[in-house]
UniProtKB/Swiss-Prot annotation:
Entries under Gene3D superfamilies matching the protein: 2.60.120.200
Entry superkingdom: Eukaryota
Domain Galectin: 6-136
Transmembrane helix recorded as keyword: no
Record protein name field: Galectin-7
Gene: LGALS7
One Gene Ontology cellular component: nucleus
Keywords (A to Z) from UniProt: Apoptosis, Cytoplasm, Lectin, Nucleus, Secreted
Length: 136
């Protein structure tokens, strides 16, 4: 098990067709966790994608952050995560957005608000036990 926060540098960035696969376990007492695709390694970097399962409020929020300001929140349908259960999330970059796949089902399509080419870091944190973070 990896510990969180987990950070993976992406010096080459990501491009359409890149797949990020996150496998882990939602702890029994989990409140929320996040996956961020950040545009830099420094604190406060812009976020091209903020994927935030919130078990405490039964929602999954998608957002972006630019120049310190969060954008408009989008929500996926229902919460495909359960406390005490393992999960697999695929985040697939395309020309027009990020497709989130949870388990075997497409979950939400988040349209790009920042250029995909700016992404330099994957960060996973919060209430989650990570098994692996892979980039294909």
């Amino acid at each position: 098990m990896s510990n969180v926060p987990h950070k993976s540098s992406l010096p080459e960035g990501i491009r359409p067709g890149t797949v990020l696969r996150i496998r882990g376990l939602v702890p029994p007492n989990a409140s929320r966790f996040h996956v961020n695709l950040l545009c830099g390694e420094e604190q406060g970097s812009d976020a091209a994608l903020h994927f935030n399962p919130r078990l405490d409020t039964s929602e999954v929020v998608f957002n972006s952050k630019e120049q310190g300001s969060w954008g408009r929140e989008e929500r996926g349908p229902g919460v495909p995560f359960q406390r005490g259960q393992p999960f697999e999330v695929l985040i697939i970059a395309s020309d027009d957005g990020f497709k989130a796949v949870v388990g075997d089902a497409q979950y939400h399509h988040f349209r790009h608000r920042l250029p995909l080419a700016r992404v330099r870091l994957v960060e996973v944190g919060g209430d989650v036990q990570l098994d692996s973070v892979r980039i294909f």
